[in-house]
Amino acid sequence: MNTHESYVVPGTGMFWGYLQALPKDYDPNGSYPLVIFLHGTGECGNGTTELDRVAIHGYPMHASQGREYPFILISPQLPEGKYWGAYIESLNLFLDHLIATLPVDEKRIYLTGLSNGGTGTYLWGQANADRFAALLPVCGAGIAWGVREMLSIPVWGFHGDCDEALHYTETVRMIEGINAMGGNAKLT
């Protein structure tokens, strides 16, 4: 089940409202994988009264319907009209906060997202590949010249060829680029 949480990044005033779902038998003294889910443009909001928009798709939707996961799930809400790529520094500070306050296994932090969040997955992964065990972008677009930064981690991209918002060739281009440079990327 999702709970509503919030965090203000010190020194920046950046407010992150987020949904949090903990494992069924959660033990604060344990150690858990962390999955961060970045939503698409349609789920942006104010981080408080509009936070449930984040649970329209993917992992947070299933958690809100009662599905339990063996990992900690964090789903932050991006402000209206914004893009994840503009908030990488703030997201890193937010991740530092999560690691400091939750029993996160730092070797098992996974980043996923769809559409705008899929693009955010590529961009945050390109900027900070050393922080993630793997990236799972869904219908996102990355920056082709940044694939070199993702060679050290597995990337599994998902994209449907009927997507009218972002053409599937964006994902094909990223996955092929990573593999052409010796990386470990898969496309579904």
Language-model region placement:
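Solvent-exposed loop/turn segments at secondary-structure junctions
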Residues: 40-44, 78-83, 115-119, 140-144, ...
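Alpha-helical scaffolding within the catalytic cores
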Residues: 51-65, 94, 138-148, 169, ...
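Primarily recognizes the serine-hydrolase "nucleophile elbow" in alpha/beta-hydrolase
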Residues: 100-101, 107-151
